[in-house]
């Protein structure tokens, strides 16, 4: 049981246009989404060809600890609103489920991340692909822990690679038990060291002006890989693709996480730390699709959508389109795309 800080799907968020109530080719996501309550003990594993489960992580405590601009706790609501009208560009054998939200209210960040970990573990055990809606980027720690917990039932030492699209390395120092939205991948490194696991971390879109020299030194010490945003924007992308290939070949599983501050503020103004020289979303989506085609991706999240700063839901809409691209790409991999 996930307790009172888990709230099952609120179907009111899934409202939109209806062109037909019978013709699936005219359906939008709000007509196809099904609620799923992770607190139920009698849930049977999904036996269809391909299923996705959305879960929101309503939290910005990590952002507050990181002295950023709070507001991302409301992100999952607005992302759902933007996803509601997306078209079903897949066959009816692809199923979409909404698993509700983890609410980090009147509990610690660490308790919230533990709840998310349990939720991700359960979603994976149901044979569904988790897509987490943030929430601060502290969502990454809970998502990773859930993936790790699930994979340990298969292999005591799973080989998981992390690909993070982010302007920040997020490997800041932290006090034990007091992480933030800037510490997750250092926390994961410490877990890997403690449990003798492989630590494979690649950060795409790093901004030199957003990280201290000590953080780059720490990344090198930890064996982390990173690609600067300027090298993606102005460099030879084939070199970047080769770097991705080298990284992905060494992994058995890949967890992909996107911090919305990787994007230029022209496309993503509603974030904790906006980036005037961030990446063009078209480039990021191109890389995400390439990574998905490795067929190793086990979980995905997009974080730091902050409605408080998001005039016209521009950033939430971008997050929805990124998620659309993820589902569209995986559906095509399974031969279920239209």
Curated annotation (Swiss-Prot):
* Record field: catalytic activity: N-formimidoyl-L-glutamate + H2O = formamide + L-glutamate
- Could you tell me what this protein is called? Formimidoylglutamase
Q: Where does Mn(2+) 1 bind?
A: 137, 166, 170, 259
Query: Any idea which positions bind Mn(2+) 2?
Result: 166, 168, 259, 261
Q: Provide one Gene Ontology biological process annotation.
A: L-histidine catabolic process to glutamate and formate
- Give the top-rank taxon of the lineage listed in the UniProt record for this protein: Bacteria
Q: Which family does it belong to?
A: Belongs to the arginase family.
Q: How is the cofactor bound?
A: Binds 2 manganese ions per subunit.
Query: EC number(s) per UniProt?
Result: 3.5.3.8
Q: Its function?
A: Catalyzes the conversion of N-formimidoyl-L-glutamate to L-glutamate and formamide.
Alphabetically, the GO molecular function entries are: agmatinase activity; formimidoylglutamase activity; manganese ion binding
InterPro entries recorded for this chain?
HutG, Ureohydrolase, Ureohydrolase_dom_sf
The scientific name of the source species is: Clostridium tetani (strain Massachusetts / E88)
Going by the UniProt record, its keywords in alphabetical order are: Histidine metabolism, Hydrolase, Manganese, Metal-binding
């Amino acid at each position: 049981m996930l307790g009172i800080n888990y709230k099952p799907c609120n179907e009111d968020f899934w409202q939109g246009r209806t062109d037909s109530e019978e013709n699936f080719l005219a359906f939008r996501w709000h007509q196809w989404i099904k609620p799923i309550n992770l607190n139920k003990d009698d849930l049977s594993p999904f036996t269809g060809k391909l299923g996705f489960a959305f879960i929101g992580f309503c939290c910005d405590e990590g952002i507050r600890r990181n002295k950023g601009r709070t507001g991302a706790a409301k992100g999952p609501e607005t992302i759902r609103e933007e996803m509601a009208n997306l078209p079903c560009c897949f066959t009816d054998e692809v199923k979409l489920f909404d698993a509700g939200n983890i609410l980090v209210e009147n509990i610690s960040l660490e308790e919230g991340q533990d709840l998310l970990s349990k939720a991700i573990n359960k979603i994976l055990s149901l044979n569904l692909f988790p897509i987490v809606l943030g929430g601060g980027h502290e969502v990454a720690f809970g998502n990773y822990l859930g993936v790790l917990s699930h994979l340990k039932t298969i292999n005591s030492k799973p080989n998981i690679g992390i690909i993070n699209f982010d302007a920040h390395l997020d490997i800041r120092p932290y006090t034990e038990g007091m992480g933030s939205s800037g510490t997750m991948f250092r926390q994961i490194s410490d877990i890997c060291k403690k449990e003798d696991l492989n630590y494979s971390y690649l950060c795409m879109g790093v901004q030199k002006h957003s990280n201290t020299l000590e953080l780059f030194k720490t990344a090198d010490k930890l064996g982390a890989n990173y690609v600067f945003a300027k090298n993606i924007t102005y460099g030879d992308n084939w070199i970047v693709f080769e770097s991705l290939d080298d990284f992905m070949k060494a992994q058995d599983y890949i967890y992909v996480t996107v911090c919305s501050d990787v994007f230029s503020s022209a496309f993503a103004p509603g974030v904790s730390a906006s980036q005037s020289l961030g990446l063009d979303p078209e480039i990021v989506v191109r890389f995400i699709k390439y990574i998905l085609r490795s067929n190793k991706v086990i979980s995905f999240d997009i974080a730091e959508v902050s409605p408080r700063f998001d005039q016209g839901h521009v950033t939430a809409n971008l997050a929805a389109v990124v998620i659309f691209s993820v589902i569209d790409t995986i559906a095509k991999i399974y031969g279920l795309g239209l």
